[in-house]
Amino acid sequence: MEKALMLFLAVSLLSLGHTDGKENAETLLKERTKRQIPKTLTVTTILEKPFAMKTESDALEGYAIDLLSELTQSLGFNYTLHIVKDGKYGSKDQEGNWSGMVGEIIRKEADLAIAPLTITSVRENAISFTKPFMQTGIGILLKKDTAAESSYMFGFLNPFSKELWIGIIISYVITSLCLFLVGRLSPCEWTEPASEQNQFTLLNSLWYGVGALTLQGAEPQPKALSARIIAVIWWVFSITLLAAYIGSFASYINSNTNQTPNIQSVEDLLKQDKLDFGTLSNSSTLNFFKNSKNPTFQMIYEYMDKRKDRVLVKTFSEGVQRVRESNYAFLGESISQDFVVAKHCDLIRAPEMIGGRGYGIAAELDSPLIRPLTIAILELFESGKLEYLRQKWWENTCSTQDQTGWVPVQPHTLGGIFLILGIGLALGLIVSFMELMCKSRSNAEQQKKSCCSAFSEEIAQRFGKTQNQEGLEKKSPTSNSCDEVKA
């Protein structure tokens, strides 16, 4: 018993020592990391909403400023912050000299650059970056009234999506064919005088479907139960469809249709001639199009390069202003565009985003600061702090109506009525076959034939040539064909 107790105490002490050792190792690692970072760092940034903005007292606030504060708490360093002197992010000229924040890092005028600075291969050759603290891409910023500019000649088709229109046309054709088949199969539809053919010809069936869609009664009127089932189901389908169309069309006219831009992608920019489009001069966005092997992106760059004096802007704010005041589309960082869209309800960003990239904190090449900063950024990401800062600075101030917008009716919205129509058509066809089988059995008893033989004869006569149809009309009594089926 004493040995067992001593063994238990020994294991407990070893476990405690292991835990303490692990905690001490983590503490030592943090202390070692802090010792690698100078007590005071010089940080450069750029005035870019919402990353860094001046308050009324000329102090700086924004996402980048809050991120810097979180890093100082985590790594225990002080900093002096200044705005980049030339107001640029950083690009290399023909002589190999760097401008902007990248240039300040290289010239050791700053230890860190915390801003929406895109991580690119060219910059990575000159400076070092941490892991991205935010992901972004290239978006298209548009003014709503120009974004939604489209052909109003066919605007009446907009309440329904293309897929729904295709479904309606297919349903109309199938219903007309079913009505035509029922008119041929059902004996009750062959009660006309011998001089007339069956009333539900293919043309009449198509016309009847159109009449129901426009809520206008159309001749001929169905007499057989099977034909009436199909007619009733089609009328229910038509009324539901028209109600949905009228409601969607009213919403389309009265709502802000600019929420669904006609410019969806960079390809759409090339296909139109009403909007100029450009980006920041000497920016990573411009270099992306310049260095891309994609033919479409090359055409985008050629367009901007030929008109660079007219379409390239010096600052992001200038690009936003041009979008709001003229027919201009601005290509730039999607994350910054999302911010201005959240604050200016007359702007919208096109759905497509290309050239995914990230924002990172920059330091001099092979700087020992990169690793501890990267670890701190990952810890902030895992704790949800970065997402909190994102929600804080990208808060949408537009009304709910501005955010919701209008969208066309999709097939899944009316899926139930399509299902009911399909069931009704199947039921109508089944009933018409039952009507014909009843008539065939009656003829078989009168003519002393087998039911199968009489049924085959009826089918052949109904889908034969005109002379066979006339023979059927003369052969079938005009007064009691439906009565026989009902009996």
UniProtKB/Swiss-Prot annotation:
Keyword Ion transport: yes
Keywords associated with the record: Cell membrane, Glycoprotein, Ion channel, Ion transport, Ligand-gated ion channel, Membrane, Postsynaptic cell membrane, Receptor, Signal, Synapse, Transmembrane, Transmembrane helix, Transport
Subcellular location(s) of the protein: Cell membrane; Postsynaptic cell membrane
Cytoplasmic side of membrane: 184-228, 435-487
Signal peptide: 1-17
Database matches in Pfam families: Lig_chan, Lig_chan-Glu_bd
Gene Ontology molecular functions: ligand-gated monoatomic ion channel activity; signaling receptor activity
Region (Disordered): 464-487
Bias (Polar residues): 477-487
Top-rank taxon, per record: Eukaryota
Main location as per UniProt: membrane
RNA-binding is among the record's keywords: no
Residues in compartment: Extracellular: 18-162, 250-413
CDD domains in the cross-refs: PBP2_iGluR_non_NMDA_like (cd13685)
Glycosylated residues (UniProt): 78, 97, 282
GO cellular component terms attached to this protein's record: postsynaptic membrane
Transmembrane segments: 163-183, 229-249, 414-434
SUPFAM superfamilies (alphabetical): Periplasmic binding protein-like II (SSF53850)
Membrane topology: Multi-pass membrane protein
Family to which the UniProt record says this protein belongs: Belongs to the glutamate-gated ion channel (TC 1.A.10.1) family.
Role this protein plays: Receptor for glutamate. L-glutamate acts as an excitatory neurotransmitter at many synapses in the central nervous system. The postsynaptic actions of Glu are mediated by a variety of receptors that are named according to their selective agonists.
Protein name in the entry: Probable glutamate receptor
Species the sequence originates in: Lithobates berlandieri
